[in-house]
Structures are given as structure tokens and as C-alpha cells.
């Protein structure tokens, strides 16, 4: 189709364009290569092109059911912005009066039909501005506006909104050095790109540039393409920004925000070519995991899945990892780095994965440095040899259990600090891989997925279950294999997990009780000194167990935050952020009573309410530590004394402003509890 319409003779331009538009009605949404090459379009021609691309050509009058009453609380603001928009276009008074009415009606009806409020910071007038140049009827103006809002403007396009966290991860993936520079300056994408995204660049581009850009963009029918266009804008601005290192934050933000204004109409073709190139170098998970940003989908995400603000790097799904290296060389191919301990890796791992024991990060840094060097050399050699395991894109895989992936996250942070591009993390880790192979539910030894998992241990006995060996070919297939691996990897922790659950149940006593002998957890043996201490977090216990490893969904209770803060037995209230091993943070509150420490995690969807995330007896606190470089990051370790020594049963980490004061009051309360126990 592109060949048929790309080159036209000047004399028959109008007719050829009309024919091309007519024939393109069914093709624009399915054939991304079928972009009609346009130039010097008249308003009616451009209107026809855009309406076909937006799939509103011939659509009925949505406004016909409306009574036309302009009575919203923010109506004065809507009228003012509508008048301002027409004034900017320099339209004669008579014609302008009708257009003001059209714009005000479109915005008002959209607000009423979608039950939203118009605010001064919205980019809607910028979206309407290019549409007004098409001389559309009020009906078509609304239909085009609605289609653009619905298909191309992402949800949560607000300050600190999810699209901007996603864009930061995309920037980090391709331009880690520039991303790090902006992070250092505390310049977030929403500070410079909120109007880019909210108006498809019309807020900052010249009218003729916006028209040329939309001519192509609307035909591409790809809402995620805006992120790659934004990326190219930043890549082009990077050199000028980096030399402004001495400038203050506001000046840099202003320079970034104005970058699209430098575009000219003849730049558009190159802009899209580069955007498509970067798109081809980006994991598809960016789209698939965030597809509900656009369109009419009202699919709700889990609270934790929605928060991209604290993600270390771009997450990639296990199915994409498995499929990617079967693609042609020009696609995204992953060099998978398995960061689990050697014991787990040897028990079973992705056949194409390179092993990097992240525990070495703390236990043997020099050996880790050699391993990293070997990793990069292996990646280089695999690329040169065209190995099935080769990939330009590094994807780190952990176990999928937060408490075990702490060191992997540190290794990952190390690579990011070195400005290594194309760095991602396998979403859900090795556990997600096991689950995916089980979910495909294909039985039999000939299943093509069987080769994905291999064991490098000398004996398979540790992986045996009641139905045979790991490498048996008795027809059990993938499910059997996965079940055995899951059994082997989890069996060792069953007893510990049961102990921890019992421990939490036994310490979840009502806060109204006073300290008594029944409150003791792990009463010290005769002659054994209390093990509670406060120190710097340089020494890690290798057997520590994060409390998040226990499924506590059934125990979570929803409470009113203020009601709990005001309880008479709450002695101290400490606002904080709970920090998970994945790097995610959740606004929380620590409440200290005479005997316990409670963590209330705020519920984003229910303001003023929180989950009771954890209850810990103060006399079970073994150690409170902090990082030298980040004194506000506090780690609490909880445990028991027994004949073998101290058994760590839970670890919790919090980011606490004025951490020194907070730990002081907690320590004082702990000492009171210990003194009471000693004297009882």
C-alpha cells in the first residue's frame, strides 16, 4: 500500500490522496508500514486522514443526547481556557465566538460523560488546538477529541503518575548515564514531560510541526510510540544538558521541557525512524505489562504491581525471556544471569543462564569482581559465536523470594551504577519460571520446554520426590519436573516457615495486656546475656529470614490509621516507608506500645486506612542496624535464643526520617521490656 500511495504526481495529487484514504480505511490499524506519505494537505484532506486513522469517520453525533447545559462547578475556568485557546489562534471575532462555544461544549460534555473534573493543569486545550485547524463540525471535533483521549493519552497522566515511572525505566534501559544524571538532580520525567504526554507534543511544537507529527503518529496506531518519541527528544537534548551540570534544577527542567520546540517539520521522518529503532531494542514486556495504561480497559492491577516508582530496573516477563532467544537476530535477545546461590543453581536452572552467585557481593567481593569479568567475556563470546544463549540484553534472575534476592539487587545496582545499558530483571525470578512451565500444562517427554531446565549437580537425589528422579522419562513431563524442583527448593524451609508462623501467632497478643511472663519469646537460658544490640549494618546474618516470605494475606487486618495512632497504649508514632528487598517502598506507620511494634502499611486506594503489615514483640528484637551511607535506612532483626544460639526469624527494613530519634525511643522501650522480664 505504501508503494501505491507514497509517490504521487503533482497534477493528480488530490484525487490520488482521496483514493488512498478511501482504500486505507481498513488498513491503517493493521499495517504499520502502510503510512500514507503526505505533504501540503488542505484542512479537509487532513481532517479525512485523521478521522480515518482515529476510526471516527462516519461516526454518529455523541452530543445529540446532551441537553447542552453548561453548568459545571468549574464552568468559568472551562470558558476562560476555551476563549484563551481561540485568542491564541488569532481567529476573527465572529468565527471565534462559534469556536469558543464548540470548545467549551466539547470539554463540558466530556467532563460530564466521563465524570471527571477539568483543572488548569490539564492539556486538553493543547489537544484541541490542532483539531481546530481542520475546520471540523462540533460532532467531528468531539469524536476526534474523545478518540485521542481514549486511545493515546495514558491513564494517570499526572504528577508522579505511573506513565512517568515507566518512562524513567525506559530511559534507564537505553540511556543509563543520562538517567543517573537526572536522578542525581532529582529531575523526574513528570517535571518536564507531563504536557508532552498529555498533548502528544502539541503543547510545545509549532503548529505545522504538530500537524506533520500527528499525520504519521495517528496512522501508526501505536499508543506506546509516544514513549519512544519522548526518548528520542531526550537523546537529542542529552549532550546540551550534560554540559549544563552546574546549572540549577529549574533551568535544566526548563531546557528539557522546551526541547520539542526545536523540532522542524522535516525532522519528523527521522524522529519516527529513530523511535522505531529504539522500540525494536526494547523488551515487549514494557508494553504487555502496562497495556492497561491506554484504551477502555478497566482491568485493575494489584497494588504492588502498579507501583513502578521504586523498581530497580525494567522488569521482563518469563515467557518473553523464553521466547526471545528463538527470534531472529535483530530482535531483543537476553543473556540471562542467574544470581541465586550455587546450591539452588546446581539443583536446577535455565539451560541458557550464566551463573553469578550474588552472595559473593558481601562474602567475597574480589571473587565477585572476577565473576563479573567472566560474565561480560562470556556474553561477548556468545554474541560472536551466535549461541542460542547469546544476547546483547542482560537479564538478571533471582529466586523470586524477596529475602533471598537482596544480594542480587545489590549486584544489579552495581551494574546500573556502571551505566550498563540494556539491563533488566526477570519478573518473579526462578519461581515464576517454574510456575510458567507448570501452567503450560503440556505432558510428555517430547515437550519442547523440557530442555529449558537443567541440573548440574552430581546427584539428583536431592531433587527426588515420590514419583522418581528429575531426569526420568516416565511420561511425567514438565509438570513432574517442575514439581520435583519446587519440592527440593522449598522442602528445607518448611520447618523454619512453620516455626515463624507459630512465632507470629504466639506474639500477636492484644496490645491492651501488660508485660507478663507469658509475653516472653525465647526466654534466655541461664547465664546467657540478652542479645539485643544496635549497630551499623555491615555484618549480615546469612540465615536471616525476611518476614515477607510468609504469606500473610489471611492475617492482614484493615484498620483506621488515625484511630490506631490515638489509642491510649500507643506510646510513639513513627511515619516511615517500609522497604522490601525488591527496592519497592510503601508509605507506612510504626506504632510502639509498651510491649509491641506494629507496622501499618497505607492502602493507596483507601485514604486513611492501612493494613496491619506486622506485629512484633519488642522483647524479640535482636538487633537494630543502619547503613553508614544511608543512616535513615533501619533494619530490625527479630529472633529467639535457643541452645544453638540466636535464631533470626524475621527481618524488617524501614526508611525513617530522623532515624536517630526513632531508634532511640524504640531502644528505650525495648530496655523497659527487658528489665521487666528480668525482674519478673
Curated annotation (Swiss-Prot):
Subcellular location: Golgi apparatus, trans-Golgi network; Cytoplasmic vesicle
Disulfide bonds: none
Domain Rhodanese span(s) in chain numbering: 330-442
UniProt keyword terms in alphabetical order: Cytoplasmic vesicle, Developmental protein, Golgi apparatus
One Gene Ontology biological process: vesicle tethering to Golgi
InterPro entries: Rab-GAP-TBC_dom, Rab-GAP_TBC_sf, Rhodanese-like_dom, Rhodanese-like_dom_sf, TBC1D23, TBC1D23_C
Recorded phenotype for the gene knockout or disruption: Morpholino knockdown of the protein causes reduced brain and eye size and curved tails at 48 hpf.
GO cellular component terms given for this protein: cytoplasmic vesicle; cytosol; trans-Golgi network
Superkingdom assignment: Eukaryota
Annotated Rab-GAP TBC domain residues: 40-221
Functional summary from the UniProt entry: Putative Rab GTPase-activating protein which plays a role in vesicular trafficking. Involved in endosome-to-Golgi trafficking. Acts as a bridging protein by binding simultaneously to golgins, located at the trans-Golgi, and to the WASH complex, located on endosome-derived vesicles. Plays a role in brain development. May act as a general inhibitor of innate immunity signaling.
Protein name: TBC1 domain family member 23
Native organism: Danio rerio (Zebrafish)
Top-level taxonomy: Eukaryota, Metazoa, Chordata, Craniata, Vertebrata
Gene name tied to this protein: tbc1d23
Amino acid at each position: 500500500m505504501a508503494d501505491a500511495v507514497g509517490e504521487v504526481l503533482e497534477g493528480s495529487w488530490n484525487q490520488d490522496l482521496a483514493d488512498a484514504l478511501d482504500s486505507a480505511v481498513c488498513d491503517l490499524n493493521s499495517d504499520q508500514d502502510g503510512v500514507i506519505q503526505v505533504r501540503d494537505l488542505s484542512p479537509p484532506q487532513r481532517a479525512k486522514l485523521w478521522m480515518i486513522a482515529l476510526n471516527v469517520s462516519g461516526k454518529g453525533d455523541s452530543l445529540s443526547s446532551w441537553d447542552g447545559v453548561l453548568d459545571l462547578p468549574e464552568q468559568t475556568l472551562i470558558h476562560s481556557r476555551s476563549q484563551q485557546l481561540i485568542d491564541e489562534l488569532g481567529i476573527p471575532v465572529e468565527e471565534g465566538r462559534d469556536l469558543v462555544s464548540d470548545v467549551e461544549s466539547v470539554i463540558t460534555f466530556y467532563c460530564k460523560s466521563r465524570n471527571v473534573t477539568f483543572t488548569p493543569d490539564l492539556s486538553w486545550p493543547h489537544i484541541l488546538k490542532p483539531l481546530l485547524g481542520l475546520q471540523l463540525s462540533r460532532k467531528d471535533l468531539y469524536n476526534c477529541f474523545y478518540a485521542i483521549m481514549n486511545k493515546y493519552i495514558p491513564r494517570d497522566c499526572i504528577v508522579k503518575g505511573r506513565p512517568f515511572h515507566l518512562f524513567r525505566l525506559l530511559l534507564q534501559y537505553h540511556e543509563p548515564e543520562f538517567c543517573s544524571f537526572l536522578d542525581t538532580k532529582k529531575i523526574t520525567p513528570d517535571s518536564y514531560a507531563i504536557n508532552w504526554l498529555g498533548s502528544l507534543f502539541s503543547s510545545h511544537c509549532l503548529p505545522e510541526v504538530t500537524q506533520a507529527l500527528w499525520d504519521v503518529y495517528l496512522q501508526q496506531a501505536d499508543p506506546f510510540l509516544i514513549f519512544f518519541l519522548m526518548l528520542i527528544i531526550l537523546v537529542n537534548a542529552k549532550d546540551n544538558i550534560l554540559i549544563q551540570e552546574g546549572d540549577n534544577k529549574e533551568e535544566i527542567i526548563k531546557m528539557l521541557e522546551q526541547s520539542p520546540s526545536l523540532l522542524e517539520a522535516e525532522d519528523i521522518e527521522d524522529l519516527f525512524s529513530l523511535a522505531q529503532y529504539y522500540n525494536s531494542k526494547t523488551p515487549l514486556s514494557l508494553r504487555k505489562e502496562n497495556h492497561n495504561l491506554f484504551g477502555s480497559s478497566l482491568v485493575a492491577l494489584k497494588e504492588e504491581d502498579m507501583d513502578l516508582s521504586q523498581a530497580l530496573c525494567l522488569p521482563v516477563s518469563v515467557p518473553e525471556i523464553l521466547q526471545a532467544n528463538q527470534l531472529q537476530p535483530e530482535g531483543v535477545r537476553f543473556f540471562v544471569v542467574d544470581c541465586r546461590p550455587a546450591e539452588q543453581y546446581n539443583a536446577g536452572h535455565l539451560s541458557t543462564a550464566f551463573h553469578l552467585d550474588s552472595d559473593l557481593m558481601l562474602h567475597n567481593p574480589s571473587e565477585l569482581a572476577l565473576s563479573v569479568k567472566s560474565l561480560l567475556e562470556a556474553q561477548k563470546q556468545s554474541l560472536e559465536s551466535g549461541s542460542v544463549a547469546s544476547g546483547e540484553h542482560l537479564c538478571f534472575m533471582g529466586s523470586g523470594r524477596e529475602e533471598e534476592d537482596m544480594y542480587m539487587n545489590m549486584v544489579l545496582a552495581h551494574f546500573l551504577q556502571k551505566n550498563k545499558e540494556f539491563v533488566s530483571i526477570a519478573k518473579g525470578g526462578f519461581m515464576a519460571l517454574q510456575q510458567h512451565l507448570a501452567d503450560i500444562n503440556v505432558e510428555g517427554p517430547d515437550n519442547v520446554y523440557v530442555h529449558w531446565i537443567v541440573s548440574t549437580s552430581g546427584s539428583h537425589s536431592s531433587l527426588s520426590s515420590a514419583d522418581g528422579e528429575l531426569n526420568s522419562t516416565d511420561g511425567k513431563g514438565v509438570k513432574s519436573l517442575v514439581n520435583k524442583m519446587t519440592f527440593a527448593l522449598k522442602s528445607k524451609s518448611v520447618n523454619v516457615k512453620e516455626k515463624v508462623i507459630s512465632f507470629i501467632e504466639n506474639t500477636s497478643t492484644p496490645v491492651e495486656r501488660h508485660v507478663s511472663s507469658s509475653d516472653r519469646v525465647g526466654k534466655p537460658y541461664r547465664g546467657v546475656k540478652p542479645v539485643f544490640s544496635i549497630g551499623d549494618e555491615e555484618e549480615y546474618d546469612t540465615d536471616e529470614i525476611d518476614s515477607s516470605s510468609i504469606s500473610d494475606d489471611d492475617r492482614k487486618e484493615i484498620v483506621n490509621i488515625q484511630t490506631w495512632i490515638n489509642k491510649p497504649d500507643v506510646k510513639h508514632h513513627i511515619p516511615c516507608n517500609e522497604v522490601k528487598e525488591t527496592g519497592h517502598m510503601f508509605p507506612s506507620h510504626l506504632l510502639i506500645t509498651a510491649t509491641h511494634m506494629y507496622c501499618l502499611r497505607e492502602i493507596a486506594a483507601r485514604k486513611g486506612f492501612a493494613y496491619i503489615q506486622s506485629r512484633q514483640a519488642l522483647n524479640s528484637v535482636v538487633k537494630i542496624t543502619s547503613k553508614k551511607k544511608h543512616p535513615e535506612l533501619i533494619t530490625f532483626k527479630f529472633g529467639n535464643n535457643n541452645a544453638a544460639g540466636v535464631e533470626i526469624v524475621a527481618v524488617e527494613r524501614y526508611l525513617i526520617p530522623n532515624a536517630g530519634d526513632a531508634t532511640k525511643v524504640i531502644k528505650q522501650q525495648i530496655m523497659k521490656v527487658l528489665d521487666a522480664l528480668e525482674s519478673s
